[in-house]
Regions:
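Redox cofactor-anchoring modules in respiratory/redox and cofactor-processing assemblies
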Residues: 1-134, 139-167
């Protein structure tokens, strides 16, 4: 019921199998992570996945944004899998997560151009959780680019017509 804490709800269904649980709220792909088991269930709460804090997925989610960018800056090999798997790219939108990852290696020069390549990202997480063979963070890089665009009050100026990928 609404207002019940996640801890109470999970204990009512059999409890935890691990000593240090972490919650993924809203699904693994687009959901958020919480370590607060006493957070109340709200009307908008959806799926809950309980994993131990030492689980690989949780460790990736706990990595600070600065570390994610540093890893992406040094390890992205520009394989383009993140772009080729992107559902928005396949629909014909000019979303290029691989190019946004490339921009991590640059200084602030040209940020307006690189940010545009992330502006139509739907943040589904497919690139980060499935497509990238290096286990990098293209979704998070796109999220950061979109946040920078919002902060600078920029709008997407890309093409207005789309042509679906012939796949």
């Amino acid at each position: 019921p609404i207002g019940t804490t996640y801890r109470e709800a999970i204990e009512a269904t059999g409890g935890f199998d691990c000593a240090d649980p972490a919650l993924v709220l809203g699904g693994l792909m687009m959901g958020s992570m919480s370590l607060n088991l006493d957070e109340p269930i709200m009307k908008t709460s959806t799926g809950v996945v309980v994993l131990p804090q030492e689980h690989h997925f949780i460790q990736r989610k706990l990595r600070p944004a600065k570390a994610q960018a540093a890893i992406g800056k040094s390890a992205c090999d520009q394989c383009r899998y993140c772009t080729e798997y992107c559902p928005r790219f396949l629909l014909g939108y000019d979303v290029q997560p691989h190019a946004v990852m490339r921009s991590l290696a640059f200084t602030g020069t040209g940020a307006d151009y690189w940010n545009q390549l992330a502006s139509l990202c739907c943040s589904c997480g497919l690139c980060t959780l499935y497509a990238c063979p290096e286990e990098l963070y293209p979704k998070e890089a796109c999220d950061d680019s979109m946040a920078a665009m919002r902060k600078a009050n920029q709008k997407c100026t890309g093409p207005t017509t789309v042509k679906p990928h012939p796949m």
